[in-house]
Amino acid sequence: MRLLVYSLLAFGALIGWTRCQDAGAAPSENPAAVTTDKFTPDWASLEKVKEDPEWFADSKLGIYAHWGPYTVAAYGSEWYPRNMYVKGSREYEHHKKTFGDQSEYGYHDLIPQFTAEKFDVEEWAELMQDAGAKWGGPVAQHHDGFALWDSEVNPWNAGDMGPKRDITGELAAALRKRDMKLITSFHHARNLQRNAGDKEHWEGWSSHFPYHPDWATSSTEDPARWLYGNVPAEEWHPYWKDQLVEVIDKYEPDVIWFDVWLNMIPEQYRQEFCAYYLNHAKERGKEVVIAHKKADLPLEVSILDIEQGGKKDVSERVWLTDITLSNQSWSYVEGQTYKDPKLVIRNFIDVISKNGVVLLNISPMADGSVPMAQQKVLREMGAWLKKYDEAVYGTRARMEYGFGSAKAKDGKYGGQTATVQYSGSDVRFTESKDKKAIYVFFLGKPTSGKANLKSLSAINYPPEFPIKRVTLLGADKELEYAFNDHDNYIVLPEDGLDETATVVKIEME
């Protein structure tokens, strides 16, 4: 294997980090809430946190971006860094044909081409805001080990190579300028090489990069070993945590989200991270959110995320789902197609009716531009949300989410899929916090005339107060209605109904 040479950089020693207030850092939200009481790194202490702050339950929508050196290939998926080393895969053959043999042209060689020359941070932040998101940010580090911030801990970072920009810091500042909050997602738990000693499992799933002595993925030299994970576990686990601490200190993210395989990190380090993050926030009067998948963290500490899916019923706990705009990869690939905006909006409504929050994913190109097809979906969603904002933001799920005829398939990662084909006969509900307003969503254009709302019948979950009026939201058109021991219906007009999703407001005394 040839020696790895990275002529663009001089790498310093990996010793600590600078703890400073950055341009992307957030001001204290509630100075009066600052306290000296500290969380300790054990679940009994950490479970005292309010894992679902009011602002998060109110927000309903966040947006993040899968973007990194893997988008240079624009082939396969964001798992290209792994699959290009899996013999027999289409990515393996594509890489050899397009870039060269893996022994001569490794994943690290793609990084200089990740230049982000069209990355406009203000355009990104504005797009997220226009889509209706209340928080946004980057995939700070995917499974590939490349940090999308200016790091003193990780030598493979966007500040020193590739874009040579502090992507996370710039986004944090641009979002907060718009009164939006920041998410940083981390997928690096599987970056450690755990299979080097087991030839039969060099392609094992517990490590991202397949091990092979002829490839850079086996390098134990600096700095390559930190990218490919060839570091003793006793060094790597602190490295995993130190990167999180650095991001917390520099950017003060409001949400830190973890992908699966977090369970492979020893409990001690997960607890130490949680304690550090929660104490850091508490000292600044902030309420933050930790999100996880499967059973990787206790529900009393962290919000559960269901990938590309949703709940089948109302959840007592606030939950999260991460959903792609694309029909293929999370990252940009050539030939990518996208979901219909109506599909995205209707599935979003289903999520919030069941006490959930949606994290939408966008897939920028390697140059930093967001394809117009993705922008179209986001802007259509934003226009719909702007029209019906009061039925969405700050509302809560009812005891019964709704009813309808749409058939939901089981999701790959639990619950149901995020691509259910709803229609105007499918109904969902939200309500105001004071329970003085119920919002009725028809997931498509409903038929005009009498619409029975069986979920609001006297024997189910009727309105809690006398009804004052019923209106077609967005048109302020009063509707005929009846809610009593015998009837529970509204009368929909022939005009003013929304093709995407029609919303009716039931106001109470």
Task: Set out the residue ranges of the language-model regions.
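Mature catalytic domains of secreted/periplasmic carbohydrate-active enzymes
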Residues: 24-509
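Bacterial Sec-dependent N-terminal signal peptides
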Residues: 1-27
